[in-house]
Amino acid sequence: MAKEVYDRSKPHVNIGTIGHVDHGKTTLSAAISKVLSDKGYSKATDFASIDAAPEERERGITINTAHIEYETEKRHYAHIDAPGHADYVKNMITGAAQMDGAILVVAATDGPMPQTREHILLSRQVGVKYLIVFLNKADLVDDEELMELVEMEVRDLLSEYDFPGDDIPVIAGSALGALNGEPQWVAKVEELMDIVDEYIPTPERDTDKPLLLPVEDVFSITGRGTVASGRIERGTVKVGDEVEIVGIKEETKKAVVTGIEMFRKTLTEGLAGDNVGALLRGIQRDEIERGQVIAKPGSITPHKLFEGEVYVLSKEEGGRHTPFFDNYRPQFYFHTTDVTGSVKLPEGTEMVMPGDNVHIDVELIHPVAIEQGTTFSIREGGRTVGSGIVAEIKA
């Protein structure tokens, strides 16, 4: 028998489970997988194999993450479950797991706990726009009023972080009950996935987004002009397209793409993920450099001031051995280049220890093409000491 071919007919969505430790994230992940596999949509992944999440390295940071996949009638899902709280934080901040939406698991027996709050805040910062609440362990709560109280608390907490707390779907159930095949709880997991299908919109595909091509290398071809090469991060580029060259320099330049090459072959169009060389008309060799981006006109602008959510590597991960303080000046590696910047710590934070995550204000010495959701590394002399994501552009 041949292996199954990956079926692209269903739209693909990335989701994950978030919430406080021991509230049942991994049990719910296993239950969803089992319930959908019993319907014949996908193979089940059991609790033990999700819990024994393999170690991955993303930009020098060690993260344990379990990836499972499953299908509903309407969609194909990739589902991320990060076992430990630190893994979850690293996952969100490094962009290792980019989620289109997430299921917030809250134990009805406990209500919202500190990590519930932190995960909601992080979801807001890194741009996970759609959350659905699963009130777990409902089989252990007999008191209807208590359930309503927990639901109200969760909704208030969501509203506090600018999520639509009143409108977010909330389902009460038992992940363990569903995993054990108890019909009333299986039905709740089925209902949860119907809501996930409906509530989380199908994301725009990378190729449908505006062009972004970070420049890695620049060279001139005598008689033809300047070529900039790099990997297309998103969007598409066609011969004849007008583009902008953004970042590093104060002035944004316009150019026209007159040729595209990949592996020494000529293309009419480059797509997200392709490593291409783009021949640019109207640009001198010294007007473009590594670290700039080639973008669809008007789609991205250069900035120096931003707020970032940052994870600082621990000593064991090869990070700093000592804390850093206000006005720390490392390099920020965006796209393809390092730019020096100075760090302002939040009020009341004296210092940041290796292994911490922190919200910082950064001022760069050059403007860089960035937007909310752009990821970066923090480096000292070429060594990565932290990883972050742009939460908000200031100027």
Swiss-Prot record:
Keywords: Cytoplasm, Elongation factor, GTP-binding, Hydrolase, Magnesium, Metal-binding, Nucleotide-binding, Protein biosynthesis. Signal peptide: none annotated. GO terms for cellular component: cytosol. The lineage of its organism: Bacteria, Bacillati, Bacillota, Bacilli, Lactobacillales. It comes from Lactococcus lactis subsp. lactis (strain IL1403). Residues 174-176 are annotated as: G5. Residues 10-204 form the tr-type G domain. InterPro entries: EF-Tu_GTP-bd, EF-Tu_GTPase, EFTu-like_2, EFTU_2, G_TR_CS, P-loop_NTPase, Small_GTP-bd, T_Tr_GTP-bd_dom. It catalyses: GTP + H2O = GDP + phosphate + H(+). GO terms for molecular function: GTP binding; GTPase activity; translation elongation factor activity. GTP hydrolase that promotes the GTP-dependent binding of aminoacyl-tRNA to the A-site of ribosomes during protein biosynthesis. It is found in: Cytoplasm. SUPFAM superfamilies: EF-Tu/eEF-1alpha/eIF2-gamma C-terminal domain, P-loop containing nucleoside triphosphate hydrolases, Translation proteins. It comes from the Bacteria. Its EC number is 3.6.5.3. Residues 136-139 are annotated as: G4. Residues 60-64 are annotated as: G2. Monomer. This is Elongation factor Tu. Mg(2+) binds at T26. Residues 19-26 are annotated as: G1.
